[in-house]
């Protein structure tokens, strides 16, 4: 196992980054009326996941690390909710929905 030297070596960051790229691709196809609504909210939310993982990695104390990793988990949960809404309003089809790296979603 390789030594973790950077936040980019963390599995959580790598998976989160894949999600960011997926969400940006998906939201590129949303209706323009969602530019300042769901599109903006989803993008901010997934960027928050990887940003909090990165910031948590740089923190010195375990307490601080846990705080930022917990915020990343909260943002992930929020993004799961947004993906369910996106599916339910018809902005994404089930096939595309199932291909997302959100294995916890049904």
For each feature predicted by the language model, list its residue ranges.
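Amphipathic alpha-helical assembly/interaction segments
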Residues: 1-106
């Amino acid at each position: 196992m390789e030594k973790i030297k950077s936040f980019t070596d963390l599995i959580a960051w790598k998976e989160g980054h894949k999600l960011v790229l997926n969400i940006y691709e998906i939201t590129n196809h949303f209706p323009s009326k969602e530019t300042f609504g769901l599109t903006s909210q989803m993008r901010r939310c997934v960027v928050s996941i990887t940003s909090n993982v990165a910031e948590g990695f740089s923190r010195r104390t375990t307490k601080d690390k846990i705080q930022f990793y917990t915020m990343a988990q909260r943002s992930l949960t929020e993004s799961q909710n947004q993906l369910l809404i996106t599916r339910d309003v018809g902005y994404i089809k089930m096939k595309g929905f199932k291909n997302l790296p959100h294995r916890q979603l049904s």
